[in-house]
UniProtKB/Swiss-Prot annotation:
Functional summary from the UniProt entry: A core subunit of photosystem II (PSII), probably helps stabilize the reaction center.
Gene: psb30
Topology in membrane: Single-pass membrane protein
Similarity annotation: Belongs to the Psb30/Ycf12 family.
Assigned GO CC terms: chloroplast thylakoid membrane; photosystem II
TM stretches of this protein: 5-25
Compartments reported by the entry: Plastid, Chloroplast thylakoid membrane
Record key words, sorted: Chloroplast, Membrane, Photosynthesis, Photosystem II, Plastid, Thylakoid, Transmembrane, Transmembrane helix
Protein name per its UniProtKB record: Photosystem II reaction center protein Psb30
GO biological-process terms attached to the record: photosynthesis
Pfam families xrefs: PSII_Ycf12 (PF05969)
Keyword Protein transport: no
Subunit structure: PSII is composed of 1 copy each of membrane proteins PsbA, PsbB, PsbC, PsbD, PsbE, PsbF, PsbH, PsbI, PsbJ, PsbK, PsbL, PsbM, PsbT, PsbY, PsbZ, Psb30/Ycf12, peripheral proteins of the oxygen-evolving complex and a large number of cofactors. It forms dimeric complexes.
Amino acid sequence: MNTELIVQLGSLTLITLAGPLVVVLLFLKQGNL
């Protein structure tokens, strides 16, 4: 496998996982306030 492909897949996975986590954190902060 190409290193570039692995990096792209890794970045896409991080973005996919980080997106919902950020939304949840913001929602919890608003809920706490």
